[in-house]
Amino acid sequence: MDYQLHEGKQISQEFPTDISTTKSSDLKSRKTDSPSIQRTHEFVNFSVFPIVNTNEIMNVDIKHFSPDLKCPTSPNIFLQPLTTTPNTTPNTSTTIDSNTEINPIEIQLQSPLLFQPEHLSPQTLKTTIPTFSIPTYPTPLNTKFQSSPPPPPPPPAATTTTTITTTTTTSAGNSTTKNNNNNNNNNNNNNGKSPKQFQDVLIPVTSSGKDGALYTVLENVPIKRTHRRRSANIDKDSLKCYQCNTSNTPEWRKGPEGPATLCNACGLAYAKKQKLTKNNIKFNQSTNVNNNTNNTITQLNQQINNQGLPNLTSTTTTSNNTAAAVNITTPSKRNNKYNTHRSKVFGEVAPSIVYTNGTLNNVGTPVSDTKKSHTFHEYMTPSNSFFTGKPIKTTKTKPKPKSKSKPGKITHTKHEQPQLNEQVQAIMEKNNLLSSSGGSGGAGSSSSSCGTSLNSSLGSSSGTITNSGGGSSGGGGGNLFSNQQLGFTCINNNVSNNNSNNNINNNDKQIQQQIQQVQQQVHQQVQQQLQQQQQVQQQQQQINQEPFLNQQNHYYQNIFQNVSTGNQNCAINTNGGFPQFESPMDIFPYNNNTTNCTQDSNGFVPNLANFEMQGNVLYNSSGSPSSLGQYVIQNNSFSGPNDQNPYVPSVSLNSNKTTNIKNNNNNKKNSKNKNNKNNKNNNNNTKINNHHINNNKNNVNTNQTIIKENNSQKQHQQQQQQQQQQQEQQKQQQEQQKQQEEQQQNLSINNSNQTNENEILGTTTTTTTSTATIITSQVPMNLSPNSDDNQSSSNYSTLSDSGSSPTDSFSGLSVNTPHPNCDSFSSSINNGSNCGSDIETIESPLQMSTDVLTINNCSSNRTTATNNNINNNNNNNNNNNNNNNKCSIKDDTFNLLTNSNLDSFGIIDCINGSSTNTNSFFMETPLLINDEDLLSSSNLTSSSELLPHSFV
């Protein structure tokens, strides 16, 4: 036989010098830089073998092989390094004689990953690393001998990831391309999976090419890493849940991907799911066991059904009965026997006792004698049912505890017995006591007790007794049986007790009705009070929202009105003073044409001199409010009975409350009387009613006290809110005043550029402040002396009192706008002489706006206004001033500021030379005062003109 040995191509492999410190990712980058050692390997490829007998193969001597093929002598050594020899004849072939015998047992495959003991491991090699060849042995082309199986997989290499490929192809081009493709495939496989979960292991893979040649390649096969417990030093901030992708959790739990891969919620859900699956597995195993046992039972039942025997099982509370087998051959006969058995059982009892489900309870047994009972349904099926081969389900009844009943009291016991009429009917039928008419019984007793009527109503034992009973009184008709036979107690009801109970029930109903009425009344009172509070709040809101200082002809209710001092009938002027109030007031204008106070003194305005207001009530000096008459205060305003006065409407105070209180008292009295009459019949009921009434009174009192406390709290809160609102308004007004003053200064500066010879501008020298605050939104304009009068500004800087009446001095009076008709303001009180000034005392700063200042009886040579600001008025005003010998200033304001130590401020009167004509200013804008003692009467003079006032 001829064997032809084809020698494979020499393949070289480069290795870096230091592989212990080299990573798999750096092999490509360091391939060209690091020094390498060229290793040449020779492989033998055997192909096209004839059929060889076994005896011939065993006789082959190994020496006839090529010297390049090295066969190790030791069976334990599978890998030997080759010497570095150049290959000069890569494609040589040798011919083997036909007499050559080959022993395949002696030809062993060399493993690439097993080393001899004397050699070093690849991790310790520094400079030279031997390469290893994997020669193949000849494979005959018969069915008996095939290629040897691949060696077992070696242990995983931790650091070495170099791919070693061995090919046995004959062409150089095919070997290089296949190596490159394999490397690319390995890289793609590794890159496609997460490096954390997989690691590469070198595994030899043998395959055959298209030409039938075999080649072996060591491939990097990714193997899934084993789960390792995470260390305690792991950065938990970088963790994220694999399920919900959250990073904020109190605890990390184990998931299918490993520990610390699920958040707390997802981990608990996963653990629960795993537990359910385990339980389901156990349940399925148990169900399989039960199915096996059930199959055996069903087989037995099928055998019984085939024989026509019923499988009836029953369970009771005391014992368990086994299945009873009846000798019935066919189902029809079985049913017949069943019906006969049923008829026998039911013949012993009354038909009415048998229920639809075929059960029978204890009949005629008292509660104390009730014990565990057997029911027929435990061993008997209904007639309309068919035997199915399954046992009938029964319910176990537990014995109920015996109820302890006291003598003389009714105990409502619950027991599982038929109704009374059914028991009676059953006993009657059992004892042949028919309901048809029979012989008349004995005379029944007339007493109402049901226990003693039996002996007198039954008569002879042989006769039948009708249900209608004997006796003229009918005592035996409803009471045929004693309590010993029926098993229940007889109740004796007294008529008196029934009547008393009925009376108690009726009285209770009346008491409940009275309670409901009182509660309704209290509820109505509370609602009325709440409505009144809401109305007051609405009125206050309206007052706060109204810009009353900016509106023309806006008037409030006047308390007292003012005319000239020539008429002494004015009530306030006769006493020479203003009343003292504790709440803010307005000063409003009064018609200048009115010259007397007769109309006011007749009832429109009360005599309020020397009166003080304390808690919404006016008191005089003696402490009695009698002089006020029928005038009352509502919402900080006066009201009286006279409807003709538009400023004083007639409104009564608390009229609704008084009527409600009276009605409530009357209702209470009536309810008490009715209760007393009803309670005379029954003392117990009277006590109960009184108890309820007292409780109701206490409830009403507590409700009233609660309402009062709530009202007081609400009033206190409202006062606080009002104070806060006032403070806020004051702050806003002060800011507005500052802004207005700045605007005025800017206007005065702008007007100074356009002054003519007739226009003279002054300077402001306001330096004083006041303890009271001005609640106005108007723009003040200060008056200054006219330059035509040749008066110095010093005459207007201060005003002091030098008159007969003692008054406090003023400081800081400044005037910006010229005074056209008066020569000057004097610093002393002249009591109406030579156009001087009268200072009358009122305790607050004064602001006046349009149509504020009216000067009467000025000199004729001063009637024509020379200032351009004054000329802005209509000419009609000047003509009227000339005709009436009066002059007025409009569209301008002046401001009087008091010193902090003053108790009053002055109203300046510009008077002509004569003291007989005393005239005053009339203000058309409210003056708001915020002091406890608003007005003082000690500093008033006879020449003063009083101003109209009213509450806010």
From Swiss-Prot:
PROSITE patterns reported in the protein's UniProt record: GATA_ZN_FINGER_1 (PS00344), GATA_ZN_FINGER_2 (PS50114)
Zinc fingers classed as GATA-type: ranges: 241-266
Biased composition (Pro residues): 148-157
Lineage top rank: taxon: Eukaryota
GO biological process annotation, one example: regulation of DNA-templated transcription
Ranges of biased composition (kind: Gly residues): 468-478
Biased composition (Polar residues): 10-24, 634-653, 746-762
Keywords, in A-Z order: Metal-binding, Zinc, Zinc-finger
Single GO MF annotation: zinc ion binding
Sequence ranges of Basic residues compositional bias: 393-412
Region spans: Disordered: 1-36, 138-197, 380-418, 433-478, 634-699, 732-816
Protein name: GATA zinc finger domain-containing protein 5
Gene behind this protein: gtaE
